[in-house]
């Protein structure tokens, strides 16, 4: 199993929800009003007057076989407009209760 955390500009919300539904991913946790900035490019997303954009973040735990489909979809979303911002991070899930 893998944990995938997706951090994205809130403008991508409908695309992320659609992807989760289309890939049959039912379980996830969502954080709203996530602040931050990219490591190499893009503007800060801080929800302030100076930097008004804001992010969301979702984490889901999935079988290994679906990881590449998720990452490919994230890459396609990012390629549509790389200035809006979306990133995905994958971790091994060794145990769960």
Question: What do these predicted ranges mean?
Answer:
Residues 1-97:
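Positively charged, small/polar-rich N-terminal and surface patches that mediate targeting and assembly
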């Amino acid at each position: 199993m893998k944990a995938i955390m997706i951090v994205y500009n809130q403008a991508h919300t409908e695309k992320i929800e659609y992807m989760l539904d289309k890939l049959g991913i039912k379980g996830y946790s969502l954080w709203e009003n996530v602040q931050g900035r990219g490591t190499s490019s893009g503007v800060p997303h801080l929800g302030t007057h100076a930097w008004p954009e804001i992010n969301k973040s979702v984490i889901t735990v999935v079988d290994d076989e679906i990881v590449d489909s998720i990452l490919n979809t994230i890459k396609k979303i990012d390629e549509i407009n790389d200035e809006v911002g979306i990133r995905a991070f994958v971790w091994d899930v060794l145990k769960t209760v």
